[in-house]
Amino acid sequence: MMGHGDIDQLITMLARLPGLGPRSARRAALALLRQPESRMLPLAHLMERAATRVKTCSLCGNLDTVDPCHICTDAGRDRGLICVVETVGDLWALERAGVHRGVYQVLGGTLSALAGLGPDDLNVRPLFERIEEGGVREVILALSATVEGATTAHWLQERLLPTGVTVTRVGHGVPMGGALDVLDDGTLAAALTARRSL
């Protein structure tokens, strides 16, 4: 790139991060390099600390510095309500929204024949173990509105049916502020199918 080994390696590593292309990576590298004391060194220290301290929660699959994670050990959480998500990023998004007061199960992906991901590749065992222990009333499937998300939701629903717990799925359809004429056919169909009375 620029003929400077260390700088090129920094840009290359930054460009591997989701959402950062080569141009954004160069800008980020420049911002870090221009202020090494106030930006780069603190960031490097935090990244090193996170790499050694952050672990995956053995109960739900969340990332935290403790295992079980803070959500799983929070006495104020409703353990009878489990929200199943694909990724830790999905869990964090729901936490930011502040609407779910139960616990979670992070699958780590979805079923995908194309990607070669089957049921054994998903983190579902802890979910079924918690259900077997008793006290779980409802499992909310908060999976993406994709073919893989729908396939995974259907597979989970079939496995959960014999347990007697209520299985629900998050609503899909028209987003807040969304105009109908700009939505794709699949979104409109999902919105009409998932309609509810007022």
UniProtKB/Swiss-Prot annotation:
Q: Which residues form the Toprim domain?
A: 80-175
Provide this UniProt record's keywords sorted from A to Z.
DNA damage, DNA recombination, DNA repair, Metal-binding, Zinc, Zinc-finger
InterPro entries, per this entry?
Answer: DNA_Rcmb_RecR (IPR000093), Rcmb_RecR (IPR023627), Rcmb_RecR_Znf (IPR015967), TOPRIM_dom (IPR006171), TOPRIM_RecR (IPR034137)
**PROSITE patterns tied to this protein:** RECR, TOPRIM
Return the similarity comment.
Belongs to the RecR family.
What is this protein's function per UniProt? May play a role in DNA repair. It seems to be involved in an RecBC-independent recombinational process of DNA repair. It may act with RecF and RecO.
Name assigned to this protein:
Recombination protein RecR
Q: Which organism is it from?
A: Gluconobacter oxydans (strain 621H)
